């Protein structure tokens, strides 16, 4: 297993919808509405992927796709990069930021939520109990978001960032989460 971790031809970019659902499930994303359903508006237009919106019966992308550059030059494929571009990547990161900081809420362009108030939110109740020990908080997020694969240098960067400012407990949790969704260990599977 450790040999595969260092093999440059092993690994894959996780699909946007998988990363989004992983965050939601890890932090018990739940509806604030009485009828308990959640509507993510405009996913297919912003992150180029949404449930039941694939362009063919086979998937969201061709299995033999390889992006230009090192991956295709070495004869490897990376199908999940077919739906990844500058705009969709930024939309996903912006969506993570809105979801983490405000919950599922309509933003300026009308995407993501359907209301001007939060339809659903992430539950930070467990994580708030870890804010007294920043390392425990980072280790917890490493486990639930990165599967325990967080590199030491990534962990140190996050701890330095958390120690560099005074946060309220909830702001510390949100700040740490915003850092985690940008990590290679969260976005790439080895």
Positions of PLM-derived features:
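Flexible, low-complexity segments enriched for small/polar residues
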Residues: 1-190
């Amino acid at each position: 297993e450790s040999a595969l971790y260092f093999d440059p031809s092993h690994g894959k970019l996780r699909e946007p919808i998988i990363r989004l659902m992983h965050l939601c499930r890890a932090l018990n994303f739940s509806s604030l509405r009485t009828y308990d359903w959640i509507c993510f508006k405009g996913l297919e237009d912003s992150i180029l992927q949404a449930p039941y919106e694939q362009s063919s019966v086979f998937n969201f992308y061709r299995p033999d796709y390889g992006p230009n550059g090192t991956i295709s030059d070495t004869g490897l494929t990376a199908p999940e990069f077919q739906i990844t571009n500058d705009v969709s990547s930024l939309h996903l990161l912006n969506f993570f930021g809105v979801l983490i900081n405000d919950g599922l809420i309509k933003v300026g362009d009308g995407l993501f939520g359907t209301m001007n108030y939060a339809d659903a939110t992430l539950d930070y109740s467990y994580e708030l109990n870890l804010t007294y020990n920043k390392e425990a908080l980072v280790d917890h997020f490493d486990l639930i978001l990165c599967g325990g694969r967080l590199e030491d240098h990534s962990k140190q960067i996050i701890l330095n960032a958390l120690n560099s400012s005074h946060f309220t407990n909830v702001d510390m949790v949100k700040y740490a989460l915003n850092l985690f969704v940008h990590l290679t260990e969260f976005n790439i599977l080895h």
